[in-house]
Swiss-Prot record:
Assembly information from the UniProt record: Homodimer.
Entry cofactors: pyridoxal 5'-phosphate
PANTHER family the record matches: 8-AMINO-7-OXONONANOATE SYNTHASE, CLASS II AMINOTRANSFERASE/8-AMINO-7-OXONONANOATE SYNTHASE
Positions that bind pyridoxal 5'-phosphate: 106-107, 176, 204, 233
Membrane-crossing segments per the record: none
Gene Ontology molecular function, alphabetical: 8-amino-7-oxononanoate synthase activity; pyridoxal phosphate binding
Pathway(s) the chain acts in: Cofactor biosynthesis; biotin biosynthesis
HAMAP family named among the record's database cross-references: BioF_aminotrans_2
Reaction(s) this enzyme catalyzes, per UniProt: 6-carboxyhexanoyl-[ACP] + L-alanine + H(+) = (8S)-8-amino-7-oxononanoate + holo-[ACP] + CO2
Its EC number(s): 2.3.1.47
Protein name listed in UniProt: 8-amino-7-oxononanoate synthase
Length: 392
């Protein structure tokens, strides 16, 4: 018996689900070169526009000159350098937690935290729309795994009543494909009533949310008692790479001792930690970036409503435009690209069948004029959709 990979790929193409990697030939920013074409992009998670910031670049360059390039080894061997340690201390202070622990990717941070905290005999309860890394972590943990209805505290409560062993409630802070916020006050209250811990992956919340960019926990005024396990990603609003888990002394020491994705992975380049220290400084000191971004979000939603687009209840830079079928989403994306606008079409299995969408992401680097250009292009392209696609 052989692996029939050709048939799998053919089926993927027939379902309009085949994915291709666009080739970025320029730095991150609103205007990019992709596959040889100059485009205005609304596809990046660089929410605060820090990925190409000259001070962040300079910090990376100086870090490489001082510390070299590679991490060299795992953190527990000889890969934990001074920049890593300083960044962990800065992230702990930023999040209001005693400790923080660096990881190479957000996927690894989520996998590490869940699998180190629960196992056979325990329970992990997750939002149905959680990121794939969280769902994978729950399945791989060996714990009893169940998903509650999206953002539904009563659905969570029913599952908490049946939970056994140590129970971990896991949710995205900002849901990456919908842009809505987890109802953390209600979820945390239910978890506390049942003696469960809450873990929040705030990959898309740090930077845009909170008075100082502290994310969804700061947005709702929740501390370590309500959210014992807080995960953040550095490759989005921070504009660099990697991730972290913040929490108590005991939590971080537990991850160091038991989290296999941490123990058996080479550390990230120290120079990246140097760059992230600078981006964290800018994230906290340049509040105008959040203010400008929030204004762009409000203006986009007003303009989209005038066009008649179907949006989701998102107060964040993630602004999905619901289209329906995968074919329809691809068509709208292609029409925008013909007009020099790059917006990705999100299709199943990333989102449920029948809910394909354009995932528009706004950043602090976008100008008012660029937003107006997007809205004008959307209005023009949307007017063409009923004639060309009637499968909505």
């Amino acid at each position: 018996m052989t692996f029939d990979l050709a048939s799998r790929l053919a089926a993927r193409r027939a379902e309009h689900l085949y994915r291709r990697r666009p080739l970025l030939q320029s730095p991150q920013g609103p205007e990019v070169t992709v596959d040889g074409e100059r485009l205005l992009a609304f596809s990046s998670n660089d929410y605060l526009g820090l990925a190409n910031h000259p001070e962040v670049i300079a910090a990376l360059q100086q870090g490489a000159a001082t510390w070299g390039v590679g991490g060299g080894a795992s953190h527990l061997v000889i890969g934990h350098s001074t920049p890593h340690h300083r960044l962990e201390e800065a992230l702990a202070e930023f999040t209001g937690r005693p400790r923080a622990l660096l990881f190479s990717t957000g996927y690894m941070a989520n996998l590490a935290a869940v699998t180190a905290l629960v196992g056979q005999g325990d329970t992990v309860l997750e939002d149905r729309l959680n990121h794939a890394s969280l769902l994978d972590a729950g399945l791989l943990s060996g714990a009893r795994f169940s998903r509650y209805l999206h953002n539904d505290a009563s659905s969570l409560a029913k599952r908490l009543e049946k939970a056994s062993g140590n129970t971990l409630v896991v949710t995205d802070g900002v849901f990456s494909m919908d842009g809505d916020l987890a109802d953390l006050p209600a979820l945390c209250a239910e978890a506390k009533r049942h003696g469960a811990w809450v873990m929040v992956d705030d990959a898309h919340g740090f930077g845009p949310l909170g008075a100082t960019g502290g994310g969804i926990a700061e947005h709702f005024g929740l501390g370590i008692d309500e959210v014992p396990v807080l995960v953040g990603t550095l490759g989005k609003a921070f504009g660099t790479a990697g991730a972290f888990v913040a929490g108590s002394e005991e939590l971080i020491e537990t991850l160091i001792q038991f989290a296999r994705p941490y123990i058996y992975t080479t550390s990230q380049p120290p120079a990246v930690a140097c760059a992230t220290l600078k981006s964290l400084e800018l994230l906290r000191s340049e509040g105008w970036r959040r203010e400008h971004l929030n204004r762009l979000v409000a203006r986009f939603r007003e303009g989209a409503a005038r066009i008649g687009l179907t949006l989701m209840a998102s107060p964040t830079p993630i602004q999905p435009v619901l289209v329906g079928s995968s074919e329809r989403a691809l068509r709208l994306s292609a029409l925008l690209r013909e007009r020099g606008i790059l917006v990705g079409a999100i299709r199943p299995p990333t989102v449920p069948a029948g809910s394909a969408r354009l995932r528009i992401t706004l950043t602090a680097a976008h100008t008012d004029a660029q937003l107006e250009r997007l809205l004008e292009a959307l209005a023009e392209c949307w007017a063409l959709m009923p004639e060309e696609c009637d499968d909505a």
